[in-house]
Amino acid sequence: MALISIEDAKAYLRVDSSDEDATVGILLASAIRLCIDIARLTDDQWEVIDSDAASSDEYTEAELSAIRETMKVAILYTCAYLFEHREEADHHALTMTLRSLLFAIREGAFS
């Protein structure tokens, strides 16, 4: 299971054709990486979040569900922002917004 597929992102962006698939895929990958970095998640933590697991050694079922929903919102927001502002994106503003969105799940220290 991927937390968000290209089809999910295209639906959120209201892109109907396959003409933008490559662009949406690149932006989605960038959005995922940016959100992982801002949330300060390790690759191992992301692997659990992006899987079908109901819980893990690190997260309860409720925590994992809440983290997944928060990450979905942040990733889709980021993908849409990058898609709509291809030419003139304000990455500082985007980063500050993502910090606010991801604050509740943000890890306390860098790994």
Give, region by region, the residue ranges found by the protein language model.
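Divalent metal-cofactor coordination and adjacent catalytic microenvironments
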Residues: M1-S111
